[in-house]
Structure formats: structure tokens, C-alpha cells
Amino acid sequence: MSDYSLKHSVTQYLEEIPQQVQNRLYTSPATCLAIYRILPPLAKFFIMAMVFNENEVPLLDLDKWVNSNGKLQFQNAIKSMKSLHLLIPNKSSGTLMINLNPTFKISLRNALTGGEVQNSFGVVVEENVVSLDLLDEYSANKWETILHFMVGTPLAKIPSEKVLNLLKHSKLMEEVNSTGEFKITNEGFQFLLQEINSQLWTLLLQYLKMIETSKMDLVDVLHFIFMLGALEVGKAYKIDALSETQRIMLQDMRDYGLVFQKHSNDSIFYPTKLALMLTSDTKTIRSASNAMDSVLRQNREEPSVNEDGANGKSTTDITTSDDLNKAGLKNQDIPDGSLIVETNFKIYSYSNSPLQIAVLSLFVHLKARFVNMVLGQITRESIRRALTNGITADQIIAYLETHAHPQMRRLAEEKLEKKLELDPNCKEPLQVLPPTVVDQIRLWQLELDRVITYEGSLYSDFETSQEYNLLSKYAQDIGVLLWKDDKKKKFFISKEGNSQVLDFAKRKLKKKQ
């Protein structure tokens, strides 16, 4: 899920809730600030232009601020703001005037200026401060436990019953009736390839749908989620300032690693870095496994590995620390899980995380594992296995690009700069991955796309050509015929049309007898 898709999913959920609930949401400055952050860029611009303006603004004036190339973005921004009831239209003297929702305007203004926020951003407790390392390690343990469970890693302690229930309702995992064990679904495989903020919101959106059937107040739930994204990591916050619904939520948020408490009955809680990602655009943590690996990262030199090619001449050189220093890259600047992808489809992952390796094995044939690196090969079989599990070629390519080694990105940028020097009008995009690898992964997907499976019934062994022609023509007339072979007197019909053809056959063939 891209950053745009993530924000679209969240705003779409907010757009679908009743207007009365939306208006209650806008009473919280923290919530209004969070909603502002996930709106389209043009919508943010319009809001900033109106939030401190007491007068109505002609809609035509907003249209004039956008050039001809941005008309589609303009329409999307206005549509989103109207769906959220952020814009209040007023048609006077033939001109359509608009203004911001007054409740939203006041709350956002207070959030921006530090006005009357009414504990919207929590109540800070100055003492009982804990270290950031402790919070990082705690959130790492909680979140990776969920992801390890999904990929089937043996665990000493599995996630809580509520987390398992959420994974099942999200259709990321399914329970095997015969054994009671959980297994990952196609959606679950795709979930593992998303960035961590997308993963968090995938679970939280399902969490919101589940609590709609409970007695919990939806507005209080949303207030708490958006508030967590605005709190400061490392500071303690009073639980007494929370509503009854939000106190119940605290246990669930602990299970996800969003908040930390020294003891379950403590009167304070601490937000973690995971909570900040709910409303942040930061990409400092690029994926769930990468985020958690960063907690345990150590400064270490990367070894040099040489492999003879098939013809005995080609050599694969893994970047050494000296090479990286020359390129302006230090060891600590290289995120764990960084990948090097070569034109011969070999892949090197700088990681010793079992989770990172497990995710990589979803579409890579792993060959060897070293202290801080894994060697693998992208093969037709490994890609087809991933494709049949619901992962798309674009998702695999996006994952490889997102986790590309900084040296690969640097070389791609230098190559593009040289092309632009020769041809300033060159519109070729930045190619971080080898084009041969990207094209081949897409071709392997096309192989599977050529084959479409249908459920249905095969009719054959007809005694006469008349019987075959009668039934095949009837199946074709009612639109359920999927395939036929007149020479072999066989045809295949859809599952939905089988009962109709059988009834027709019984009536017509019985008359002939």
C-alpha cells in the first residue's frame, strides 16, 4: 500500500461515518490536526488559506489558484473536504461561497496556536521518565511478535487472543478448523510487504469496524488513536485524563506496541515511536521488519564476498566499508535489510533478522546465510510461488526498490544524471533496479495471467451428435458456455449454469426416448 493509498483508506473511512459523528470528532484539536495531515496536499493548502480567515471565500477563487494541470487534484481535494463536511457552502447573490466547518476551524486553529486544547494532547507527567531505548525495544518486541506469528516463526509466546481475533477478522490469517492453528492468507502475504504505517492502519481500520458492534464510543476511540499520533515519545501521560472507553483501549494498544506501561494497573502510559507513525509522513522506518531491526542495529563492517560466475570470469563484489566511505556512505547510514539486486538475479540482503529473512523468502530462493547477510536468487519458481499466494509483481518490485542498498540508488542517480547531460529532454525515470530483473518479474506474472480458472462442469460422452448440438447450443444461448470442442463432442459450462442445463437435458432427452 502506497502512502497515497494509505491516506485514501483512512479518509474514506472517515467520509463514510455519519455527519453527527464527524462533527463530534472536530471538537478535538488533536483529531483535527491529524485529519489535516492525511488530507491531499491541495486540500491542506485551501484549509491553511481559510483557517484564520473569518470571511467566506468564493469557490471560484480557489479554482483560480490552481493551473490547468491541477484541475483533477482540485476536484479531488474539494470532493474530499465536502465528504468530510469540512466545507460549508453558502450560495448568496448567485455566487457559491464556502467557509470551513466552524467547529473544525476553531479546533485546528487552537492546535496550531496552542490555544484551548482541553487535554486533547494528553496530560504530561514530568516524573517517571523512561529511556527511549526501552520504549523502542518494547514496541519492537510487541510488533515483531505479531509479524513473526504471521510468517510461522516458532515463538515462545504468541500474540494475545484479541490480536489473533483481529488478524482473523482482517482476513490476514485464517483458522484451520481441524487443528485450530492459524495460517496466513493471500492478504496476509501482501500485508507483510507493506510499510509499517500501512500495516498499523490496516489493523486499526479493522479494529474500528469491530468496535462498531460493541458499546464503545466510536468518537472516543478515534480521538485516542489520533491523539497517540500527536504525543511526544519518552514522556509519561496521565491515564486519569482518558475516558472510560479510552482506558479499555489502552490494553489493545499495548498489545500492538503503540503504548507502554510498566504495570497494567499503572496510572500513566508512554507512547512509542510506532504511535507517531499513525499521523506522520516520516520514512525513517521503511518497513516493519526494518523498523524493528533498527533497534538492535550495531555498527559493524560489511565483508567482501566474491563469487565466480558461470563462465569463470564474472565476479560479484559486495560493497566493503572502504568502498562505502569513498561513496560518502558510512556503515551506520546503511539500514538493516538493504538489498543489492544484480542483473544475474542474485540478491544480497544485509540483515540477520529472522523476520526480514522470512519476508524475503516469500519471493526469493535463499541459498546461504552469513553473520550479517543473506544470499539468494530470484527464480521463476520463487516468483510464481509468491504470485499464487496473492503477491503481485508490482508489490515485489516496490519492495525491492524501497529496500535497495544506498549504493544502488546512488549509482542509478549518477547514471540518470549522465543521460540528462546528453539529452536534457530525457524523460526516463530513475531505475534503481536492473531493468532486466524488473521486466522478467512482470513477464512471469503475465504467464500466470494468461491462465484463467473457472469452476464448472464438463459434458462429454454424448451418444449422438444431435444430443451434443442440442445441449451445447442451449448452454450458449443462456450464456453459460465457457468452452467447447465440436470434434470431440465436449463442452464446459459455468458452475452457476449447471443446474439449468441438467434440467433442460432431462426434459429434452427424456422426450426423445
UniProtKB/Swiss-Prot annotation:
Disordered as annotated region, ranges = 296-319
- GO terms for MF: ATPase activator activity; double-stranded DNA binding
Q: What is its main location?
A: nucleus
* Record GO biological process: nucleotide-excision repair; transcription by RNA polymerase II; transcription initiation at RNA polymerase II promoter
The keyword Transcription regulation belongs to this UniProt entry's keyword annotation = yes
GO cellular component labels: nucleotide-excision repair factor 3 complex; transcription factor TFIIH core complex; transcription factor TFIIH holo complex
Work out whether the entry's keyword set contains Transmembrane: no
State the compartments where it is located: Nucleus
Q: What Gene3D superfamilies does the database record attribute to this sequence?
A: 3.30.70.2610
Q: Quaternary state and partners of this protein?
A: Component of the 7-subunit TFIIH core complex composed of XPB/SSL2, XPD/RAD3, SSL1, TFB1, TFB2, TFB4 and TFB5, which is active in NER. The core complex associates with the 3-subunit CTD-kinase module TFIIK composed of CCL1, KIN28 and TFB3 to form the 10-subunit holoenzyme (holo-TFIIH) active in transcription. An additionnal subunit, TFB6, plays a role in the dissociation of the SSL2 helicase from TFIIH after transcription initiation. Interacts with TFB5.
Entry function? Component of the general transcription and DNA repair factor IIH (TFIIH) core complex, which is involved in general and transcription-coupled nucleotide excision repair (NER) of damaged DNA and, when complexed to TFIIK, in RNA transcription by RNA polymerase II. In NER, TFIIH acts by opening DNA around the lesion to allow the excision of the damaged oligonucleotide and its replacement by a new DNA fragment. In transcription, TFIIH has an essential role in transcription initiation.
Misc. remarks from the entry: Present with 8900 molecules/cell in log phase SD medium.
Q: Which family does it belong to?
A: Belongs to the TFB2 family.
| Name by which UniProt lists this protein | General transcription and DNA repair factor IIH subunit TFB2
What species is this protein from?
Saccharomyces cerevisiae (strain ATCC 204508 / S288c)
What gene does this protein come from?
TFB2
